[in-house]
């Protein structure tokens, strides 16, 4: 029997660690959290809680028969104020029994959860459930919390002798043999170092996680019911989620309010007597900066300079360096993965998690390819620096290696104990692992590898030339820049599109443009001069990358939570994506407006950022967690009471001050139905006037242009129609053309253009394109509708029936929930192979039986991952949020209030 037990969060991580520890250790997984707040109640001891009504008939009496006094209301002076009530997560009894069984036979138990607040909290809860000597773990949690298992409720209803599914039947262990170990990378050296210095649970880290959880729970569970009452059920608010929505909504308001200003630029093509001709731009007038506001001014300047003598006024040459970027932090990884690979933050973090926990590399087995991916530090270990400095001269030449390592400064509140996101072994190049990784994993690993190697290379060097040319009273300027040494750019190229570049990747004016040799005083010939009209542009809408950047710069939330925050506001239909940029839906704007008006201080950017700083202070042991929550509560409860009385209701109708167009007597009220927002008469039902507020085709896009949607198939305009499931876009060519497009909350789903592929159609020879249909993406002929060739896009997972085809996502005309098409997964060789499954396949092997893939499916108790193989009972519940970052709290909708 193994002498020591090691517990981690996931089977993949357990598999990777197990091969490094040897036979003296058994490594098992807790499958994420084992304890959490209850799903259907707030689960926190709050100051306004009323005494619970006692069950049973008559008064509760003491031993001598005297009547017991009712429990006193909870006040802010209560010693256990804001205490969370933790439950064992439903279905975890089997996991806990298994861990207890192994722990009882081990001489030591090591909790090896991730090295952050969430990992520390998981470890603290594991220590509790392993060591508390009660059958159903009605237990004292870390720092005085009380944890009460949902299983206890089941036990009270169970018949005598009947086995309870989640009963904790294995005895607890001695808490003295429980230790905590942490490591930033899953490598033999890092693991050995961690086990040489085990420690106890860090209560400061646990307190910081607990404080964040309590704050998020208070906001979600207290404000969300307000939205149910005032707007509609199922909506949610979140401490950080709502601030992110506010940023997007306020940016949209800026765009609408933006007034375009005309301005002109003037460009001259000049001949210096030797090639090439070069361009100069109007720069100054009589030595002062100049603005050209209109065509009249531009024409006057043109008339003056056409008659002027063009002469070189000055020539300046200098060498300019572009320094390499630092290795990735979490947020920078999310930004770069979106800009370069178009990966969402959620997708990036899911892929990075797999690279961190371990992937199969043939005979090597499971290998962790990157360090821990949730970090705000750019620190790199000395061993990693030595290794990359060995690689650079061997692979690229000694001219690319700086004399000493490049060191980068992390932001002030970064955890220097963590490292940047980097390869665990930089000598394991992307080419070495290419055959073992799918495209998505490979591209992300390649990006991380390239960024890390580039960070330790020499700067790129450019020869920059600036020529000022006089033309009478006016000065024109030409700038050219030619790369002299590529440096780190040998490895880490700039994205082709300027819009996809980070702030420190912006090209200088004239980069890549050569200028002829000229001397001061040299006369030039004017070859051509042209004016160009421009208009100022409104601030751009946020992309995932720029939203993450804004949140980080404002100190809102933490990079580890950005993926879940962005996913939530999209899933709640508060925002939609239009060509990769976030636009608030009508619902999102209304919700943001209500919350910001009633809770302006709670959802203020600076206030939210200050709360994040306080969480850091709790982690450092500088601030008691209850004090931070109490200060928030005292401000919040005042706003909550005021909002309960004063927040306007879209259910009741919000007066617009406009008379009804039909009866002329009633006032138009803005209201909401299941189809979206509309205007209705206050005299309803006597007057049934209704006006849909869904944006129409003539809606202003915010940049002065009118949006008109055209049919993909016939080219005719699309019109908004209403059907049994709400509004949608339909072709005006109906019935000859029956094309439709879905709308969300009255706003159109962005049209996604066809993406050309480097492939020819087997029927007609035209190019193939990736198309977007009602059932998802597919490949079709660019010659449509003349050629109707199509084929599905495969998922890279072999069909288990024929072992030749691959899974594809399909849809049928039959309806799923809420009128949606029914989605299923089948073999790409259909009709030769008719295998189908309603469950989504996932390219991960079963940790129990080794089956080549698992599936995600919905059960009565929630979504689970399970083995597809008949006879294998492996199953893993999918928590509502990633184990490392809980989604912000919102109550589960229950029966409507009477």
Task: Briefly describe each language-model feature range.
Residues 291-326:
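Metal- or metallocofactor-binding catalytic centers and their adjacent structured scaffolds
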Residues 1-210, 283, 527:
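Intrinsically disordered, low-complexity regulatory segments
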Residues 212-222, 240, 270-272, 320-332, ...:
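Core structural elements
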Residues 87, 113-115, 133-138, 198-206, ...:
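Short, polar/flexible loop-turn hinges at active-site or ligand-entry regions and domain interfaces
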Residues 186-268:
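C-terminal or mid-to-C-terminal helical accessory/interaction module adjacent to the motor/catalytic core
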Residues 2-5, 15-16, 25, 132, ...:
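Basic, low-complexity terminal or inter-domain segments flanking catalytic cores
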Residues 16-20, 98, 102, 121-129, ...:
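Alpha-helical scaffold elements adjacent to nucleotide-binding pockets in ATP/GTP-utilizing enzyme cores
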């Amino acid at each position: 029997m193994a002498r020591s037990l090691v517990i981690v969060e996931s089977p993949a991580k357990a598999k990777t660690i197990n091969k490094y520890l040897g036979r003296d250790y058994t490594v098992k997984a807790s499958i994420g959290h084992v304890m959490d707040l209850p799903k259907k109640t707030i689960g926190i001891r709050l100051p306004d809680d009323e005494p619970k009504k006692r069950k049973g008939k008559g008064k509760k009496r003491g031993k001598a028969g005297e009547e017991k006094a009712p429990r006193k209301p909870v006040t802010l002076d209560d010693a256990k104020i804001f205490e969370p009530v933790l439950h064992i997560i439903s279905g975890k009894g089997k996991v806990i029994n298994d861990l207890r069984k192994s722990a009882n036979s081990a001489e030591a138990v090591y909790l090896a959860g991730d090295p952050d607040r969430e990992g520390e909290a998981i470890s603290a809860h594991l220590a509790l459930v392993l060591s508390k000597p009660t059958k159903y773990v009605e237990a004292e949690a870390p720092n005085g919390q009380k944890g009460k298992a949902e299983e206890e409720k089941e036990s009270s209803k169970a018949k005598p002798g009947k086995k309870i599914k989640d009963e904790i039947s294995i005895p607890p262990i001695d808490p003295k043999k429980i230790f905590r170990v942490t490591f930033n990378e899953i490598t033999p050296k890092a693991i050995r170092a961690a086990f040489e210095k085990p420690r106890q649970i860090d209560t400061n880290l646990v307190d910081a996680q607990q404080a964040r959880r309590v704050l998020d729970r208070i906001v979600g569970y207290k404000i969300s019911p307000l939205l149910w009452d005032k707007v509609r059920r199922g909506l949610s608010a979140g401490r950080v989620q709502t601030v992110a929505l506010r940023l997007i909504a306020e940016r949209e308001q800026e765009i609408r309010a933006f007034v375009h200003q005309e301005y002109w630029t003037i460009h001259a093509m000049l001949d210096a007597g030797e090639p090439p001709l070069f361009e100069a731009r109007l720069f100054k007038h009589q030595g002062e900066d100049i603005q050209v506001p209109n065509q009249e001014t531009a024409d006057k300047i043109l008339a003056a300079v056409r008659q002027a003598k063009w002469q070189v006024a000055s020539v300046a040459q200098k060498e300019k360096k572009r320094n390499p970027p630092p290795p990735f932090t979490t947020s920078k990884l999310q930004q770069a993965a979106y800009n370069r690979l178009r990966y969402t933050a959620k997708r990036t973090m899911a892929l990075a998690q797999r690279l961190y926990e371990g992937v199969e590399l043939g005979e090597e087995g499971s290998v962790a390819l990157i360090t821990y991916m949730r970090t705000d530090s750019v620190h790199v270990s000395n061993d990693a620096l030595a290794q990359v400095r060995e690689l650079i001269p061997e692979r690229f030449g000694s001219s690319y290696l700086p004399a000493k390592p490049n060191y980068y400064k992390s932001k002030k509140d970064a955890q220097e104990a963590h490292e940047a996101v980097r390869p665990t072994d930089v000598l394991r190049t992307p080419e070495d692992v290419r055959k073992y990784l799918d495209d998505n994993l490979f591209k992300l690993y390649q990006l991380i590898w390239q960024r890390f190697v580039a960070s330790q290379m020499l700067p790129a060097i450019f020869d920059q030339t600036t020529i000022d040319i006089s033309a009478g009273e006016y000065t024109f300027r030409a700038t050219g820049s030619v790369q002299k040494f590529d440096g780190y750019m040998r490895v880490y190229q700039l994205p082709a599109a300027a819009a996809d570049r980070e702030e420190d990747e912006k090209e200088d004016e004239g980069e890549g443009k050569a200028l002829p040799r000229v001397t001061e005083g040299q006369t030039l010939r004017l070859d051509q001069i042209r004016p160009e009209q421009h208009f100022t542009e409104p601030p751009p809408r946020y992309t995932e990358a720029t939203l993450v950047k804004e949140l980080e710069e404002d100190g809102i939330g933490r990079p580890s939570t950005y993926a879940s925050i962005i996913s939530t506001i999209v899933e709640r239909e508060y925002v939609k994506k239009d060509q990769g940029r976030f636009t608030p839906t009508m619902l999102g704007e209304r919700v943001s407006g209500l919350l910001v008006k009633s809770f302006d201080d709670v959802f203020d950017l600076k206030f939210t950022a200050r709360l994040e700083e306080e969480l850091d202070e709790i982690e450092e042991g500088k601030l008691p967690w209850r004090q931070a929550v109490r200060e928030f509560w005292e401000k919040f409860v005042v706003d909550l009471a005021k909002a309960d009385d004063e927040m306007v209701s879209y259910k009741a109708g919000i007066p617009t001050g406009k008379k009804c167009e039909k009866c002329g007597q009633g006032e138009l009220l803005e209201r909401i139905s299941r189809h979206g927002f509309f205007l209705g008469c206050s005299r309803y039902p006597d007057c049934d006037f209704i006006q849909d507020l869904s944006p129409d085709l003539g809606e202003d896009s915010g940049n002065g242009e009118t949006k008109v949607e055209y049919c993909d198939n016939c080219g005719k305009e699309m019109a908004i129609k209403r059907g049994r499931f709400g509004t949608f876009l339909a072709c005006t060519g109906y019935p000859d053309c029956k094309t439709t497009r879905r709308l969300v909350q009255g706003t159109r789903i962005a049209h996604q253009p066809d993406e050309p592929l480097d492939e020819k159609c087997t029927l007609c020879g035209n190019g193939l394109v990736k198309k977007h249909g009602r059932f998802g993406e597919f490949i079709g002929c660019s010659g449509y509708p003349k050629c109707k060739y199509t084929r599905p896009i495969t998922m890279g997972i072999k069909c288990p029936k024929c072992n030749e085809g691959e899974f594809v996502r399909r849809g049928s005309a039959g309806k799923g929930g809420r009128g949606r098409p029914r989605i299923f997964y089948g073999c790409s060789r259909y009709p030769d192979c008719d295998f189908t499954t309603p469950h989504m396949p996932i390219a991960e092997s079963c940790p129990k039986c080794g089956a080549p893939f698992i599936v995600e499916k919905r059960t009565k108790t929630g979504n689970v991952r399970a083995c597809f193989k008949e006879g294998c009972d492996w199953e893993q519940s999918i928590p509502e949020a990633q184990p490392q970052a809980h989604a912000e709290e919102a109550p589960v909708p229950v029966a409507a209030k009477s």
